[in-house]
């Protein structure tokens, strides 16, 4: 009897150790609110990327090595359907984990992952907008022609070395689609990028970041499947009483023959000012083109009230301007809603 109890205790210890070495986590966020103009409004998530859940896992393989995976699904709060960056539930409707789906290995030398994921420039630039890129007040530069997400990607991330971190990625030329390439500015008020994706270059990208204390600076490069190239420079500094963020992106659009069609430059500056449980946000973004009647700009202002660490109320206003701010594209937009993270 004592031997049986001892055996059970030993097995239990091994089982506990094994379970402690691996884990699977469910996380995500839900956003619902009203978005519109003075003439029209609709119910939905202003920050569409906040209506998503992630299944992630990690297993300790010993010797400082671990295996991990991420599966990320986005949905529409108003009807429960799948959602993509276009907001159209019909796009990529057969792609369950449209946002991210990859597996990888990590060690002291960094990590390498394979699957579908954000490319380095788009992975970096979202962190330098005070509005987190998605609300109507957002002054995010958007990545110009940079690949947003790529299928069949191999992605390397180095460990942090003295505050510096390098990332690089390459994807297969086949199997990419137009919806994975950026190409609009200020929600229809700016640049429109032609979708000449039939020359099938391999999407590639790299980034270099320095982060230490209040400082965060980075550079990123991207070439999409049409051969369009984008350079991005980013920076932020946390002064304590407020945080200042900036972005600058430059891109050249080439046709199949390699002749330059358009050169675009876009920059933004924004700030986050915490006042107790309230966070004030404000920013300005502007872009220029070497072609006539293509300039655009936008001013955004908003606020977020933290009910807890995971739940907040928000409201924002975005006012586009410039050459392309005509018709509905020039309407001032607003949103008001609630976000809960889990």
Located regions from the model:
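Outer-membrane beta-barrel proteins
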Residues: 1-342
